[in-house]
Amino acid sequence: MRVKIHCKKFDTEFKMALYAMTEFAMARLVESKRLRNNLSIDVHFRHHSAEGEAMIDHDTNPYRPRHFRVVIDHHRLEEDNYGRKRDVTEWAHEVLKTLAHELVHVKQYVMGELSMRREGLCYRGVHYDVKTLTEYFELPYEIEAYG
């Protein structure tokens, strides 16, 4: 598996933790070593519209994706839901937790459980029409990702 971390101003120890987390999570989620060895995951840390997003890379086959981009907005994770600033340890924990959540979505893409179709995302062949944030958190693929 090829993992590339794109970030600025992260110390080496934290970058190593990100690599280790990615390797560990994917080893647990995707049992087939042959399949894991053919995966490519680019993790980008930058401003984004959500805390995190896992997506199929635009150059890969959408029916059997093997190349993925994970975008994490580490700036959004600096404060909790109540507006309090997190210390460095809490922030690092939230970043790793968000990375793990997005890697579950990568696993869902790899195993064919989650797929991108014309009408949007389909989970196990069913398209879910989401209108509210509450409905979004009740989606089966989000429930699995949140554990």
Question: What are these model-derived regions, one by one?
Answer:
Residues A17-M21, F137, Y141-E144:
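Soluble or luminal CAZymes and related metallo-dependent hydrolases
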Residues K97-V110, A145:
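Active-site recognition of the HExxH zinc-binding catalytic motif
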Residues K8-R69:
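Auxiliary, metal-adjacent structural segments of Zn-dependent hydrolase domains
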